[in-house]
Amino acid sequence: MTRTSMITMIPKILTISILLTVLAGCALGGYLPLPGEYQIEEGFAIIRTDSLQVAVRPQSYRGGYRDLNNNFFSVYVMVRNVSTEKVKLPMESFSIVSGGRQYDYVDLEYILSSYHQQMVLEQWQDPFNLDPLQPVDQEQNMEDYYELMASYLSFGDLQPGAAKEGYLFYDRNLNRAQELIFDALGIPVTYSKGI
């Protein structure tokens, strides 16, 4: 290699190095399930009962309303009915214990009303601002609103062989916990925060 070609490669190498460092930094700090009475696959704890298979993982909300991650601690849950009969998924099926305190999930109605209030307030921009940098996109806000509704885990009857999946949201103070126990259908799953 000539000296000129080496000099032109330095910015590329630096860019790749920085990108890899950022990606590695994003991967750290997540919650990982500790071994227990469940399987672990791709960060999910997989719990099996006679009639249900449940996969659980603390995970940032990936929908359009990204501010939700600042306001709540989110957990992604997948539930499959492995029996030949209809099974009821009770609303009290999932909770989190951390620091000796139990946290129940936040109702969807509360989250949606909070988001709706934010959308209404965004419409009333500063009247003295002559050059708003970003106009309010009401259509996008409504899409994000409905996407949030659709991605929330629903409870109730689960038909044979059918599955439900979605997010449950908890108190944001759980983001600071080094360890937490997610109770899924009475089976405790311990998660520890990565380094």
Model-derived features with residue positions:
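Conserved functional micro-motifs across diverse proteins
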Residues: 26-195
